[in-house]
Curated annotation (Swiss-Prot):
Function: The coatomer is a cytosolic protein complex that binds to dilysine motifs and reversibly associates with Golgi non-clathrin-coated vesicles, which further mediate biosynthetic protein transport from the ER, via the Golgi up to the trans Golgi network. Coatomer complex is required for budding from Golgi membranes, and is essential for the retrograde Golgi-to-ER transport of dilysine-tagged proteins.
InterPro entries in the record: ARM-like, ARM-type_fold, Clathrin/coatomer_adapt-like_N, Clathrin_app_Ig-like_sf, Coatomer/calthrin_app_sub_C, Coatomer_g_Cpla, Coatomer_gsu, Coatomer_gsu_app_Ig-like_dom
Keywords: Cytoplasm, Cytoplasmic vesicle, ER-Golgi transport, Golgi apparatus, Membrane, Phosphoprotein, Protein transport, Repeat, Transport
The keyword Acyltransferase is annotated on this UniProt entry: no
Superkingdom as given in the UniProt entry: Eukaryota
Entry annotated with the keyword rRNA-binding: no
Subcellular location: Cytoplasm; Golgi apparatus membrane; Cytoplasmic vesicle, COPI-coated vesicle membrane
Name of a matching Pfam family: Adaptin_N
Segments annotated as HEAT repeats: 265-302, 303-340, 374-412, 414-450, 525-563
Protein name as catalogued: Probable coatomer subunit gamma
Biological processes annotated in GO: endoplasmic reticulum to Golgi vesicle-mediated transport; intra-Golgi vesicle-mediated transport; intracellular protein transport; protein secretion; retrograde vesicle-mediated transport, Golgi to endoplasmic reticulum
Species for this entry: Schizosaccharomyces pombe (strain 972 / ATCC 24843)
Gene3D superfamilies attached to this UniProt entry: Coatomer, gamma subunit, appendage domain (2.60.40.1480), Leucine-rich Repeat Variant (1.25.10.10), TATA-Binding Protein (3.30.310.10)
Annotated family: Belongs to the COPG family.
Length: 905
């Protein structure tokens, strides 16, 4: 064939004029007595083109096509048969009565059929059956799962995976066959001889063993809710490493091991040596996967991570870009939580700043920013400027996020960082990039008071030429909040006024709201009058939203004393609690009485700022970080914990008279191991005069139920007096709550004690034939771990912008010295003390330097609203064992400071 330019001009795509009408008409050829495989494949490719480009076939039309295509089963051409199965799978979603071709497909699943037919037939078979007909194909799939031919075994395993949601019990019965597919050296290791390979493909493919990967995925799905069975499987595979030969399966095995290591401390200790061994073998893909998963383990020691850092350091000099990228990205992730471990790699990382791959260079810079110190910041900032124009917006956002974190870590370097952020606002970039820069400047304004004046001025300059209305609205909101607090608030009014004159209605509305805050918060009468004049002019605006806001604002300025408490309220309802209360109010449908907003817990601005600061310091590049299924489930479960426990608490009428919940535990505390028959978690709820301990009990035994389950909780001191116990009537498979309420001793406002806990219940066995519990049961008890009531239960983190000034102004002071013998570094001491006291570290003091003495600043608010601050001075003990700390607390009362200094013991 000639491939001249003339031929190219006359060549037209077969998809040029394809539509549903012509395809449906042409499909009548499938009913003819003589079928041309070539023409049929051409027509099937047109149908596939329509489906994959989003064309939707009507049910009747799809059914006609579906049964027309089934006529092609009479032709034995392997390529045509493969295409038939592809289209059958796609049309089976829309067409009617697809189950009628089950027998035709099942013929191709027989072991004696052409090898090319069987995998495709198995995949198509599960698309045309329903849950009721799964038993009819059970033998086909179980035979396929243990088939020695790789394509057949993979097809059967993937099909079983898709069947699991609709036939969970049946697929679970195939547990032994699936485990054989993982551990056997015969299953899925061959490629059958077929004329199709030599005549059509021209070669015979190799057996990749990919069926082992599919089998491991299916086995995990079957066993994932049985941690004991999963533990045994993983230990079996680890002890016989030769069993897992496929690299993809090995990577999946590592991920499953990591997810279980986070849940089981004993299992983690057993697996760490194996992971260290795999760091030096099995190929780069496995090495990097081990490193990434070890970095993400929550409770792993620094010593266990040292081999990981050493291996990643070697990979940084690899000649393969993908390997260097994976290594630097993993180190970047480690630097977010343990920057001190990455210091040894800094020289290697600096060499990557000039890497031709700008993605690698970006991660190198951001990693160095996270591990840098005061001396290296300025040098790194100069290097960043040189390549910012060469990278995409996505990576620019990563750099900006790293700069933002660095601002919070080294507030003294705010001048150079603010200059950098201001310059990139003037550069070309998309909305997300500019928004990230504005958010970074906003954080500097909020958490670094020294930068406020200049940062606000930079935002005012940017807003003059801002092309994104959403960003303009964001900046106006910042100006409205922070501008009135500046030393010269009037300098910002001109920029806001320009927005009213020049921008669209959305921005004008935001400008009106910002001006209103200036008028309400300004003490200068001239400023109030000027703002009122501008707002009065807005009453004639063409947009009704602007007019409405202006009318409200003018009224607020005229009656300033009445509106000021509303506008300047520093108490904000807890949004999760507000949402939960509104849902309950709507579901009860008692609209005769109004919604009681006073029942919703409120948060102060300091508490909100402290939580926001904690989140920002813990932020990772979510867009570029993959999350394993186990991590994703854990995150989802964690987000629902507060609602789950508080809903159960609100359902108990005995606690209604206690008043609002002042504080709850930030996360459930486990009082038993995850693998025990009775799993108990606990959350502490603090009220004004009461402590309610909520025990969540999960009975994992399917053959017994528990009745009248209670927890006998005994305080170690007289500071708590038990008031009532709310038992769980029946405990079967679902978690239930047991409550124990204590009243505070009048003489001790903040009781610190230890609760000794014993679970008591009546056990009744389940009749295996009827599924009903036996009438007779027996009394039993189960010992669970003790629970400490500590200082952190009465303190919430609270952000304070002027720590030194407030510390000097507070009158009540107490101090105490402790030796923490189990800790060996300032970093671990900072983390432990902040966790015990539940106070907010300030000014980056939670990141110690290499100096021999370190001071950490902490801020918090007690449940009664009192502010309390603490200085924690620390030094290495003279004998070299542990860290010596001195806690100096200042607060609004003696009881508050005594609580803080006594909270470390």
């Amino acid at each position: 064939m000639s491939y001249s330019k003339k031929d190219d001009d006359g060549d037209e795509s077969i998809f040029a004029n394809v539509n549903q009408v012509t395809v449906t008409q042409d499909a009548r050829a499938f009913n003819s007595s003589s079928i041309s495989p070539r023409k049929s494949r051409r027509l099937l490719s047109k149908i596939a083109y329509l489906i994959y480009t989003g064309e939707h076939f009507q049910e009747k039309q799809a059914t006609e096509l579906f049964f027309g295509i089934t006529k092609l089963f009479q032709h034995k051409d392997p390529s045509l048969r493969q295409f038939v199965y592809i289209i059958i799978k796609e049309l089976s979603v829309v067409a009617e009565d697809v189950i009628m071709i089950t027998s035709s497909i099942m013929k191709d699943t027989a072991t004696g059929r052409e090898t090319i037919y069987r995998p495709n037939a198995i995949r198509s078979l599960i698309r045309v059956i329903d849950a009721n007909t799964v038993p009819a194909i059970e033998r086909i799939l179980t035979t396929g799962i243990v088939d020695p031919i790789s394509a057949v075994a993979s097809a059967a395993l993937v099909s079983a995976y898709h069947l699991y949601p609709v036939a969970k019990d049946i697929v679970s019965r195939w547990n032994n066959e699936v485990q054989d597919a993982v551990t056997s050296h015969n299953v899925g290791r061959k490629v059958a001889s077929s004329p199709f390979f030599t005549s059509t493909l021209g070669y015979t493919p190799n057996a990749s063993g990919i069926s082992q990967y599919h089998a491991l995925g299916l086995l995990y799905r079957i066993r994932r809710h049985d941690s004991i069975a999963m533990n045994k499987l993983l230990q079996l595979l680890v002890s016989n490493l030769g069993t897992v030969s496929n690299s993809h399966a090995f990577v999946m095995l590592i991920r499953y091991i990591s997810s279980l290591m986070d849940q089981n401390t004993q299992f983690r200790d057993q697996m760490v040596p194996f992971l260290h061994g795999w760091l030096k073998s099995k190929g780069d893909m496995v090495n990097l996967e081990v490193a990434r998963n070890m970095v993400r383990l929550k409770n792993i020691s620094d010593d266990d991570l040292q081999p990981v850092v050493s291996v990643l350091k070697i990979f940084l000099s690899s000649h393969r870009s993908a390997t260097r990228f994976s290594a630097i990205r993993t180190l970047n992730e480690l630097a977010m939580t343990r920057p001190h471990l990455v210091h040894s790699c800094n020289l290697n990382i600096e060499s990557l700043i000039t890497d031709v791959n700008r993605s690698i260079a970006t991660y190198a810079i951001t990693t160095l920013l996270k591990t840098g110190n005061d001396e290296s910041v300025d040098r790194l900032m100069k290097q960043i400027v040189t390549f910012m124009s060469d990278i995409s917006d996505n990576f620019k956002i990563i750099v900006v996020d790293a700069i933002r974190s660095l601002c919070l870590k080294f507030p003294r370097k705010q001048d150079s960082m603010l200059t950098f952020l201001s310059n990139i606002l003037c550069d070309e970039g998309g909305y997300e990039f500019k928004r990230a820069a504005v958010d970074a400047i906003s954080d500097m304004i909020k958490y670094i008071p020294e930068s406020k004046e200049r940062a606000l001025a930079e935002l005012c300059e940017f807003i003059e030429d801002c092309e994104y209305p959403k960003i303009a609205v964001r900046i106006l909101s910042i100006l409205g909040e922070e501008g009135p607090k500046a030393s010269e608030p009037t300098r910002f009014i001109r920029y806001i006024y320009n927005r009213i004159m020049l921008e669209n209605a959305i921005v004008r509305s935001a400008a009106v709201s910002a001006l209103t805050k200036f008028g309400l918060n300004a003490e200068d009468k001239f400023v109030q009058r000027s703002v009122k004049v501008i707002l009065t002019r807005c009453l004639e605006d063409a947009d009704d939203e602007v007019r409405d806001r202006a009318a409200f604002s003018v009224k607020a300025l005229e009656d300033r004393d009445a509106f000021l408490p509303v506008v300047k309220s520093d108490k904000i309802p807890s949004l999760p609690a507000l949402e939960r209360s509104l849902v309950i109010y709507i579901s009860e449908r008692k609209f005769g009485q109004g919604f009681d907003i006073k029942s919703v817990p409120v948060l102060s601005q300091e508490e909100i700022d402290a939580e926001n600061l904690r989140i920002k310091k813990a932020t990772t590049e979510v867009e570029f970080t993959e999350v394993t299924p186990a991590e994703d489930q854990n995150a989802l479960a964690s987000s629902n914990i507060e609602t789950e426990f508080l809903n159960a608490l609100e359902s108990v009428s005995e606690f209604n008279e206690y008043g609002p919940v002042l504080k709850s535990s930030p996360s459930p505390i486990e009082l038993t191991e995850q693998e025990t028959e009775f799993v108990v978690k606990v959350v502490k709820h603090v009220f004004k005069d009461h402590l309610v301990v909520q025990f969540q009990l999960h009975n994992t035994l399917s053959e017994v139920i528990l009745e009248n389950a209670v927890v006998v909780s005994t305080p170690s001191t007289d500071d708590l007096v038990e008031e009532c116990v709310v038992p769980a009537a029946i405990v079967s498979g679902e978690p239930v709550s047991i409550f124990v309420s204590f009243k505070f001793n009048d003489s001790v406002p903040y009781p610190l004690t230890t609760l000794t806990n014993t679970l008591q219940f009546t056990t009744k066995e389940i009749d295996i034939h009827t599924g009903e519990p036996e009438e007779e049961g027996y009394e039993d008890e189960y010992k669970i771990d003790d629970l400490d009531v500590s200082a952190g239960d009465f303190i919430s983190p609270a952000y304070e912008s002027n720590f030194d000034g407030l510390f000097d102004s507070l009158e009540h002071e107490a101090s105490e010295v402790y030796v923490l013998s189990l800790l060996d570094s300032f970093r671990s001491t900072c983390s432990r003390v902040a966790e015990l006291l539940q106070m907010q570290p300030l000014e980056g003091t939670e990141n110690p330097t290499d100096k021999p003495v370190h001071v950490m600043k902490l801020s918090g608010k007690l449940v009664n609203g009192e502010k309390v601050l603490a200085l924690v001075k620390m030094a290495h003990s003279k004998d070299g064992e542990g860290i010596t700390i001195k806690v100096i607390a200042r607060g609004e009362s003696d009881s508050s400071v005594e609580l803080v200094v006594g909270g470390i013991a």
